[in-house]
UniProtKB/Swiss-Prot annotation:
Disruption phenotype: Impaired autophagosome clearance in fat body cells of starved 3rd instar (L3) larvae. Conditional RNAi-mediated knock-down in muscle cells disrupts transverse-tubule (T-tubule) and myofibril remodeling in internal oblique muscles during metamorphosis.
Protein name: Vacuolar protein sorting-associated protein 11 homolog
GO BP annotation list: autophagosome maturation; cellular response to starvation; endosomal transport; endosomal vesicle fusion; endosome organization; lysosomal transport; organelle fusion; protein transport
Gene expressing this chain: Vps11
Any one Gene Ontology molecular-function term assigned to this protein's record: ubiquitin protein ligase activity
The organism of origin for this protein: Drosophila melanogaster (Fruit fly)
């Protein structure tokens, strides 16, 4: 189940609601149950469910879920199997102590609250094996069919008129060597077809038999004999209601759910897993799959739309017992926390508008349309809206023909403007004409639609004429002019009484048909872009990208735009600079012209240098560098002179050392913009020291010394990592020489200790643990001996250090006495 189910498309079109007023016994007390399945009841009293418990009680649930209870005969044990017929007769199988079985037929039509249902027929027989399944049904209230499947592959069959005691009319037949776990009848009641068929499913194998009177099973058909997978559950899907044309046997295996007809195997649905239950309601197949990946008793309930091949519901239930299916409803029975009852749930379909919205969100337009057709909304505004959205989706995918077909089906519901506005481009001309033609057939044509149809027809004629002419063979100016006129009429087809084409529309036309139109008549088309349609500078760069092969034209057009809009985006200036560089490479402009353009428009130097180097424009790059250097020197000299004069005139005032010259000038300009503000008033922005141009050398030397010390420590740490691989980590404590356990401490110096052997609390220094051996060495070194305090007031501290040294010496002598080398390599990390 885990693999195949994830491959299906999923949309939750159902939900679960609780049916609290139905009281069903706990599953531990139920011995068997049955319901009509797809059998059609013609009686007024419709029975939904029959439950037989282990206390010989028979619970009958009516159509309104009212429950009537009565007991089976006192001489019988608990009922083991039961089956409900289409005329409300209940067939039961009760075993006895002699390995025999009692078969009783109850007439539920005569059941009342005060009087139990009477037994109208009974039989007793000795089966050859344990009964596993039971099915019973009637044909025109004349023939009664009853079949019991046994564990050894045999069947007990009664087929004929029912009598008070029909024990003598029961026949035993052998089907296969595997246990029979399902029996289903398919009775034909048409005058031309009276064939009575019985399907039998075994643990391995599916068979079909023709029934005849006197309990004869004739003409055995082996529908499936696959021994690779076991048959878990099976149901009969009856024809009728206009939803299913032929009756089918539905069998659930571990690999999939298979359907069979008397002619052979039918559809197959790839849902893997052990099948706990099967049901068929309308177009929906309901499958309960046992989840083998969980230790707990969990079952995944899957509802499959067999027509659209999608999963419309999927939910996991704990201890799912069984599923009750009807023509339009499905009920789910699960165990609850209450030991005396079960939970009754109903599988309910969402409202049609919610389901359509969910399908449209996942772009399942075809399924949404079929669902609307199934619900009777074939010609409705809701369906037209879905078709309009479907047409938009197809248009974006490039399927113009199918999109137009969907748009045509919306005529009468969707406003024509909504469709026409999407098909106005030249490449949609044929599809727009088809839509307008269909719209004209169903509606009265207006003058606007007539002119639009004429425009589309004219476009088709011009396109046809252009396709017949090959402009490469034209040498006559008159013919070229004629073809240019056709091109302009086709690509920019605008009636004389309408406004000119907008710039965005012209841009789309150029994207579609630019190469063809430029090849026919370059001047006319480019002039149309420049003078007629380009009224703003926002889209001009899009035209420049399309016309990349026409550098001269683009440069002139950009120059005109920049001249018309002096305060334009800097991006336009750099695009124009790029075009000038391309023309300079072709010797169409001089280097002086390009340099003058750069100086005139004051372009950013960093971007200008990058672009000029890209086009190997080095001579002007050198000029720019020289000009920038001279300008920078003059700028700095001016600032220094200004600061010097300010400090000279105000000796008590000094600048902040972190204040840049540029910031200082900006502050000075904003402060002294009026004559009322004097230099003394801006004193708070200065400090009592002059602006320093160099860093304090003493602080710099101290920083260098600190960084060198940090580098030295890092190198030492790195050396320990590189010289001590993990393979040679110490495995014994350096104090007790016992094997190290999980509670151990490792140091980078290659020493390791037990946690209880190392008194790390006494060696804690600045929140760092120190090795007891290495610390002893450091304390014995001469550089540490001078650190002892000789002050009489610190006697306790001196004694503590001396005692500590003695302890370390004793430890060191003990380690040397063991002749353990201190050079053992180890990894300090566990």
């Amino acid at each position: 189940m885990d693999i195949s189910v994830f491959e299906w498309k999923k949309v939750d079109l159902f939900n679960i609601i609780v049916v609290p007023f139905v009281k069903i016994p706990n599953t531990a007390e139920i011995s068997c149950y049955c319901f009509p399945e797809s059998k059609s009841s013609t009686e007024e009293r419709n029975i939904k469910l029959v439950i037989c418990d282990k206390n010989r009680n028979i619970l009958i649930y009516l159509s309104n879920w009212e429950c009537i209870t009565f007991k089976s005969p006192s001489t019988r044990k608990a009922i083991a199997l039961c089956s409900l017929t289409s005329n409300n007769s209940l067939a039961t199988v009760t075993p006895d102590i002699n390995n025999g079985i009692h078969i009783d037929i109850f007439d539920l039509n005569r059941l009342t609250k005060k009087q139990a249902a009477p037994i109208i027929a009974s039989a007793y027989t000795q089966p050859s094996s344990t009964p596993l399944c039971l099915n019973a049904d009637v044909i025109d209230d004349k023939l009664f069919a009853l079949a019991i499947g046994l564990g050894n592959g045999d069947i007990l069959l009664h087929y004929g008129k029912i009598t008070k005691n029909f024990s003598a009319n029961i026949r035993q037949h052998t089907v296969s060597g595997n246990a029979v776990n399902g029996i289903h009848f398919d009775f034909k009641t048409q005058p031309l077809d009276t064939t009575q068929i019985m399907f039998v499913t075994c643990v391995q194998g599916v068979y079909c038999f023709m029934l005849k009177e006197k309990c004869i099973m004739d003409t055995k058909f082996v529908l499936d004999n696959d021994k690779g997978n076991l048959n878990y559950r099976s149901i009969m899907c009856k024809a009728g209601g206009g939803e299913i044309n032929d009756s089918m046997l539905v069998v659930g295996r571990a690999d999939a759910v298979y359907c069979y007809t008397p002619e052979g195997r039918g559809p197959c649905f790839a849902i893997e897993g052990a099948k706990e239950c099967l049901a068929w309601v309308g177009h929906y197949l309901i499958v309960g799959v046992k989840n083998s990946n969980l230790k707990q008793n969990a079952t995944t309930l899957i509802v499959l739309d067999t027509e659209n091949k999608i999963i419309v519901f999927q939910r996991q239930f704990q201890e799912l017992f069984y599923v009750i299916s009807e023509n339009n409803f499905c009920y789910i029975v699960t165990n609850s926390g209450d030991t005396d009852a079960c939970n009754m749930l109903m599988l309910e379909k969402n409202s049609i508008d919610v389901n359509i919205r969910l399908l449209v969100e996942k772009h399942m337009y075809n399924i949404a349309l079929r669902l609307l057709h199934r619900e009777g909304y074939t010609s409705s505004p809701e369906t037209a809206l879905v078709r309009f959205q479907y047409g938009n989706h197809l248009l974006q995918k490039g399927d113009f023909s199918r999109a137009t077909q969907e748009f045509i089906k919306t005529i009468g519901f969707i406003k024509p403007y909504a469709v026409i506005s999407k098909l106005l481009y030249s490449r949609y001309n044929t599809y727009l004409l088809n839509y307008l033609t269909e719209w004209k057939k169903k509606n009265e044509s207006s003058s606007c639609h007539t002119r639009l149809i004429e425009c589309c027809i004219k476009r088709d004629q011009i396109e046809h004429e252009m396709q017949q002419d090959d402009f490469k063979h034209y040498k006559s100016p008159a013919k070229i002019k004629h073809l240019a006129t056709l091109s302009k009429m086709y690509f920019a087809c605008t009636p004389s009484n309408q406004v000119p084409v907008e710039e965005e529309h012209l841009l789309h036309q150029l994207l579609e048909y630019g190469p063809a139109s430029l090849a026919v008549d370059l001047t006319t088309y480019l002039n149309n872009i420049t003078f007629e349609n380009v009224k703003e500078s926002k889209n001009i760069l899009s035209f420049c990208s399309i016309l990349a092969d026409h550098n001269d034209y683009c440069a002139k057009m950009l120059a005109k735009i920049i001249e018309a809009f002096p305060v334009c985006d800097e991006k336009l200036l750099f695009y124009l600079l790029v075009f000038y560089f391309k023309l300079w490479r072709l010797d169409k402009v001089t280097s002086s012209f390009v340099s003058d353009f750069i100086k005139t428009h004051s372009l950013r130097m960093d971007k200008t240098i990058i672009v000029s180097r890209l086009y190997t424009f080095f001579n002007v790059t050198q000029r720019i560098h020289g000009h920038q250097k001279n300008t920078g020197t003059l700028h700095n000299e001016t600032i220094d002179k200004c600061i010097e004069n300010l400090i000279k005139n105000n000796p008590d005032v000094a600048l902040n050392e972190n204040l840049s010259k540029r910031s200082f000038l900006m502050m000075l300009k904003s402060s002294c913009s009026t004559e009322e503000i004097k230099a003394i008033k801006i004193k708070p922005i200065f400090k009592d020291r002059l602006l320093r141009s160099i860093v304090d050398s003493a602080n710099e030397l101290k920083l260098v010394e600190n960084f060198n010390e940090k580098i030295k420590r890092s190198r030492s740490m790195l050396s320990l990592y590189t010289n001590n691989p993990i393979e040679f980590r110490n495995d014994k404590c350096d104090i007790c020489r016992e094997m190290l356990s999980m509670q151990s401490i490792y140091f980078l110096c290659q020493h390791s200790f037990h946690e209880e052997c190392l008194n790390y609390k006494s060696t804690k220094r600045q929140e760092k643990f120190l090795c007891i051996i290495c610390k002893t060495r450091n304390l014995l070194s001469p550089k540490h001996s001078s650190n002892f305090s000789c002050d009489s007031s610190d006697t306790i501290a001196v004694l503590a250090k001396i005692v500590s040294i003695g302890n370390k010496l004793e430890t060191k002598l003990m380690i040397r006495g063991r002749q353990k080398s201190d050079g053992v390599t180890c990894n300090p990390f566990n």
